[in-house]
Amino acid sequence: MDLRLLHGVAYGHSWFGKWGYRFCSGSFGVEEHHYHRAIAFLTSISLVDDITANFRENKANLNIGDIVRCYRDMSEIQLTTLQDLLRFMLTIKSRAPPIRIPIGKIEAPSVVLPSMKAYGTRACPQVKQCPKDKEKSVKCRKFALPLPYRLAFTSLSVVV
């Protein structure tokens, strides 16, 4: 489901509605009345009757009920509809503190990346290692991170 639609379900207006824009000529082939009908339908879905009951029947999706239960336990208000749940989830996400990891605490991942030649595409240029005794210019020293730290930053992900 698209974030634009989820935001509409949670708050009753599109994400751009925060700045006074409204749904006008259609987006991605969706007309305004279809958009509003979809929002109204998704807003009215009950968590207890519709969501958790339907997912309880399908054994592959048992953890959906656990996820809903987790957010209901975290909330101070009663979450009864999909709109309540999405509004709470988006509020939690927007208020989550940024994760700050001191540079000295990051370790390089011990993953060996396969060569691009194995995929039949152009090979990536090899990273040339500079000799240890060769000093970088002042301009480069300010912004360059050692390769292990760059790899660690690209492999970090946050799940909320």
Curated annotation (Swiss-Prot):
It is found in: Mitochondrion. It comes from the Eukaryota. One of its GO terms (cellular component) is mitochondrion. Keywords: Mitochondrion. A stretch of 270 kb of the mitochondrial genome is duplicated within the centromere of chromosome 2 resulting in the duplication of the gene. The expression of this duplicated gene (At2g07714) is demonstrated. This is Uncharacterized mitochondrial protein AtMg00550. It comes from Arabidopsis thaliana.
